[in-house]
C-alpha cells in the first residue's frame, strides 16, 4: 500500500511531467563515465534542464555533468566507488541491486562492469526524480523502485550481488535489516555493505543520544567486531573487511547544490577527530558478506 501511494505521488509530481516532456524530445546524448557521470547533448533544452536540476536540490550523490552544467554534489561519491572498484568484477553478467540508491550515481558507474540487470531501491520521490532526469538523457536500462530494504524478502526477484551503502546505521533493527538483505540473495550471493563504525576491539556499538554528527536518525554505530556479530546472527557465513576510511571535508562538503550545512559544520571546531556532540568523527568500514 505504501509503495503504491509513493508511486502515485511520484507520477503526479509536476517535475515528473517536466522530465517526461524532456524525455519525449528524445535528445541525442553521449553518455560517458569518469569521476562524473557525463551527458553531452548539445541540445536547445539547456534552460529547461537547468531549471529542473535547480528544483531538484539538494543533490547529495554525484557529481554529474550535463553539457556545460556541472552538478557539484555534496558528496564526491567517486571516492567511495573507487574503494569498491577493485571488486566490481563480481557484478559482471549478474543480477545486481543497490539498496538506498539515492539518485543512482553508483548504478550509472556500475554500467561499465556489464551487470545483466541493475535495480535501485529507494523510497524517496526526490531522489527518484533526480534519477529520472539523468536517465531521460542517458537512456540506460537501469530500473528504480520506490521501495526500501524491508521490501526485499517479498520483491519476487533475487539478486546475485546487493550493494547497501550508508543505510544500516539509519535502521533501528540492524540485524533485521541484514536478514532482509540475505532474503534478497540468490544462492552464493554476496552483499557489499558500508557503515560508520567506532574504533574499539570490543563487540559494542555506540547508541547516540539524539544526533550523531548532527544527523538525527542514527541508531547504532558499531565496532567492526559488533558488525561481524550482527552479520553472523543474520545468517551470513562470510565476512571480509575490504577497507576503512575516515570521512573528510574533501569527500563531503557544502556546495551550491545543497541548501544546508555539511561535514565541516558537524565536527567539533576545536578537534576534527570529534563530532560536534563529542563522539568519534565519522569513519567508514567497507565489508563483503556472503551466505
UniProtKB/Swiss-Prot annotation:
One of its GO terms (biological process) is tRNA wobble uridine modification. InterPro entries: CmoB, Mo5U34_MeTrfas-like, SAM-dependent_MTases_sf. Carboxy-S-adenosyl-L-methionine binds at residues 61, 75, 80, 100, 122-124, 149-150, 169, 284. It catalyses: carboxy-S-adenosyl-L-methionine + 5-hydroxyuridine(34) in tRNA = 5-carboxymethoxyuridine(34) in tRNA + S-adenosyl-L-homocysteine + H(+). The gene is cmoB. Its EC number is 2.5.1.-. It comes from Campylobacter jejuni subsp. jejuni serotype O:6 (strain 81116 / NCTC 11828). HAMAP family: tRNA_carboxymethyltr_CmoB. Belongs to the class I-like SAM-binding methyltransferase superfamily. CmoB family. This is tRNA U34 carboxymethyltransferase. Catalyzes carboxymethyl transfer from carboxy-S-adenosyl-L-methionine (Cx-SAM) to 5-hydroxyuridine (ho5U) to form 5-carboxymethoxyuridine (cmo5U) at position 34 in tRNAs. GO terms for molecular function: transferase activity, transferring alkyl or aryl (other than methyl) groups. The keyword Transferase applies. Homotetramer. NCBIfam families: PRK15068.1, tRNA 5-methoxyuridine(34)/uridine 5-oxyacetic acid(34) synthase CmoB. Keywords: Transferase, tRNA processing. PANTHER family: TRANS-ACONITATE 2-METHYLTRANSFERASE-RELATED (PTHR43861).
Amino acid at each position: 500500500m505504501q509503495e503504491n501511494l509513493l508511486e502515485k505521488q511520484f507520477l503526479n509530481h509536476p517535475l515528473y511531467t517536466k522530465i517526461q516532456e524532456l524525455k519525449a524530445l528524445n535528445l541525442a546524448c553521449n553518455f560517458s563515465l569518469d569521476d562524473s557521470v557525463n551527458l553531452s547533448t548539445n541540445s536547445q533544452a539547456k534552460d529547461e534542464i537547468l531549471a529542473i536540476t535547480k528544483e531538484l536540490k539538494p543533490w547529495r550523490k554525484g557529481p554529474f555533468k550535463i553539457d556545460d552544467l556541472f552538478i557539484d554534489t555534496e558528496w564526491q561519491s567517486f571516492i567511495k566507488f573507487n574503494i569498491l572498484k577493485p571488486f566490481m568484477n563480481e557484478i559482471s553478467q549478474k543480477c545486481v541491486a543497490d539498496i538506498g540508491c539515492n539518485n543512482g550515481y553508483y548504478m550509472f558507474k556500475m554500467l561499465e562492469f556489464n551487470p545483466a540487470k541493475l535495480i535501485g531501491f529507494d523510497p524517496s520521490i526526490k531522489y527518484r526524480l533526480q534519477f529520472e532526469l539523468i536517465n531521460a538523457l542517458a537512456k540506460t536500462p537501469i530500473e528504480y523502485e520506490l521501495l526500501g530494504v524491508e521490501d526485499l524478502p517479498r520483491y519476487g526477484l533475487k539478486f546475485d550481488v546487493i550493494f547497501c551503502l550508508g543505510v544500516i546505521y539509519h535502521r533501528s533493527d540492524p540485524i533485521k535489516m541484514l536478514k532482509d538483505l540475505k532474503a534478497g540473495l540468490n544462492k552464493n550471493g554476496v552483499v557489499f555493505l558500508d557503515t560508520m563504525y567506532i574504533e574499539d576491539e570490543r563487540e559494542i556499538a555506540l547508541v547516540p543520544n539524539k544526533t550523531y554528527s548532527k544527523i538525527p536518525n542514527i541508531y547504532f554505530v558499531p565496532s567492526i567486531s559488533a558488525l561481524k556479530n550482527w552479520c553472523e546472527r543474520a545468517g551470513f557465513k562470510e565476512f571480509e573487511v575490504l577497507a576503512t576510511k575516515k570521512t573528510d571535508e574533501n569527500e563531503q562538503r557544502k556546495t551550491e547544490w545543497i541548501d544546508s550545512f555539511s561535514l565541516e559544520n558537524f565536527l567539533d571546531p576545536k578537534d576534527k577527530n570529534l563530532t560536534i556532540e563529542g563522539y568519534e568523527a565519522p569513519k567508514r568500514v567497507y565489508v563483503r558478506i556472503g551466505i
